Amino acid sequence: MLELKCELLTREAFAPFGDVIEASDAVKHFTINAGNTERYHDLADIHVGQDGKAIVSIFRGQPRVLPFIVSMMERHPKGSQAFVPMSGRPYLVVVADPKSAPGAKDLRCFLARADQGVNYAPGVWHHPLLALQETSDFLVVDRSGPGDNCDEVPLTESAVIRALG
């Protein structure tokens, strides 16, 4: 079984899969509200398609235990999907290139800090929520609308995540 090594989540490394949502000097930001608030502006490219609308939900993820076997992936072809952690804990992100059916050799694992969210671009293969340590809440912005917007596939060969670093 292929072992996945987790890398730290960065904007550059995650760019082929979507956006990293974080308050960073690397993004456009400016002061508003008479100087009392710093706005980190336009952090994610949200897609909902012509017939969809953006919705905001909270997902409550149960903690995953390592070693963890990655045996399936999913994607949302009609819209993006953003996850922003609310519980102050790191979590894992597993993704694969949207251009082909994912295999274990195509997977990448990222360790996201508690202050980093992710926005999966439409069609990007990803593993469902991978909370760590304790039950964790995530603010989710995704698409509601007609049509099937969730494809799930089993992997022909599984991969294992044994450690965070």
Give the location of each predicted region.
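Non-catalytic, conserved peripheral segments adjacent to functional cores
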Residues: 1-109, 133, 141-142, 146-156, ...
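His/acidic/aromatic-lined binding-pocket segments of jelly-roll/cupin-type domains
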Residues: 81-84, 117-118, 129
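Short hydrophobic/aromatic-rich beta-strand segments that constitute the beta-sheet cores
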Residues: 92-93, 119, 127, 140
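Conserved metal-binding segment of the jelly-roll/cupin
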Residues: 111-125
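Ligand-binding loop in jelly-roll beta-barrel domains
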Residues: 123-139
